[in-house]
């Protein structure tokens, strides 16, 4: 009787397969926790880096502005005129249709990625691009955007070209995946590269989908007349910023 009772009290052995399964599950859980922790630390480090970059850019922009003011004051004090450096960046907006226009004009508008009315793009200014703008000047409004305009356009209307699709830039991770190899990992990097026309301007600008702007508040005056004659077409220099405000 005692032998039977002892047999009843014995705990059945756990099968080896179950032990292995439990061990594998525990190891997998540890790996997942480690990966989750590593990702959390990476996000934290990236947020800190983005914050530091934004702070650095703000300081750089402020320094650029102060230098311009100082140079203008020095020139005025010496009785001279201060001539700012030639603009390196333009923002171009298509304002007219192209029915009946020459193939050359049509081709240039395609090269500028202005396929629809009220599309806008950034353009790096050089001899070749200025000649292109002159060819299509009756069909575009363009000028020199300030930092505020570049910032607001990208933050409010910025879409990226990701896998040939138009994707809203709602997360810095989208920018990092596409432009991280060029050192551009966040919105502030993208804005800085465009505004300063940096070494990777071409890659940054091609990543940005052409901006789809709204019809300007108050409407257009005369699309077929040049800006200097009271119309809308052509180079309006710094006044492009007012038009951007009306269309953004």
Swiss-Prot record:
The modification Phosphotyrosine is found at residue 139. GO terms for molecular function: DNA binding; identical protein binding; mRNA binding; RNA binding; structural constituent of ribosome. The keyword Acetylation applies. GO terms for cellular component: cytoplasm; cytosol; cytosolic large ribosomal subunit; cytosolic ribosome; endoplasmic reticulum; focal adhesion; membrane; nucleolus. The modification N6-succinyllysine is found at residue 127. The modification Phosphothreonine is found at residue 17. Its main location: cytoplasm. GO terms for biological process: cytoplasmic translation; maturation of LSU-rRNA from tricistronic rRNA transcript (SSU-rRNA, 5.8S rRNA, LSU-rRNA); ribosomal large subunit biogenesis; rRNA processing; translation. Keywords: Acetylation, Cytoplasm, Phosphoprotein, Repeat, Ribonucleoprotein, Ribosomal protein, RNA-binding. Component of the large ribosomal subunit. Homodimer. Interacts with DHX33. This is Large ribosomal subunit protein uL30.
